[in-house]
Regions:
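Ser/Thr-rich, low-complexity intrinsically disordered terminal regions
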Residues: 19-185
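Bacterial Sec-dependent N-terminal signal peptides
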Residues: 1-21
Length: 185
């Protein structure tokens, strides 16, 4: 009987440790001081490229990157050097173990604005919101005291990864002059 009691007490910490949930990982976001919205901002330099060339490269990138790019372009002004893109992508639910499922939880919408000057461009992603039955700004999901905070942390991590993918893809496309370096016929 003593042995059984000892065995039970020895196994108890393992059962308790197995029930512990790890804290969710929250991505760090840049919050614009004026608008108080989540934003991604960069001003990369592209030496030797004119504003017009950067504009053309962006239009090519957009048609390659987005499905139905023409529907996503809200503003395109080559003379002023500005393109505004309104895009969206789906987010998916996570189960209790933190594994992504195939169940769609709505769409995330964002506005990508790109301004061009000779040798550089400014990209800004802002106005991120969750579209389901109604629109919900993602800034509400930053509340770690929210009852659904664990799911919000998963969603925000996915959203941050998607935004960084958009930015890196755009930067790679604009840095590439498109010259194949082949024979000039």
């Amino acid at each position: 009987m003593r042995f059984l009691t000892f065995l039970l007490l020895a196994a108890l910490p393992f059962g308790v440790a197995a029930q512990k949930k790890s804290d969710p990982v929250w991505p760090s976001f840049n919050i614009d001081s004026k608008t108080e919205l989540i934003s991604y901002n960069e001003v990369p330099e592209v030496s030797g490229a004119t504003a017009s060339e950067l504009y053309d490269r962006t239009m090519k990138w957009g048609s390659d990157y987005y499905k139905n790019f023409g529907e996503k372009v809200r503003k395109q002004d080559k003379e002023a050097g500005e393109i505004e893109i309104f895009a969206r992508f789906p987010i998916y639910a996570y189960d209790k173990k933190g594994v992504k499922t195939a169940s769609q939880q709505g769409l995330i919408q964002y506005t990508l604005t790109i301004l061009f000057k000779d040798g550089r461009y400014k990209l800004e992603i802002t106005k991120l919101n969750h579209k389901e039955v109604s629109y919900q700004p993602l800034e509400l999901w930053l509340d770690k005291a929210d009852p659904d905070a664990v799911n919000h942390a998963f969603y925000l991590t996915d959203i941050d990864a998607e935004m960084k993918t958009v930015i890196s893809s755009l930067k790679a496309a604009l840095a590439d002059s498109g010259d194949a370096g082949g024979d000039d016929w």
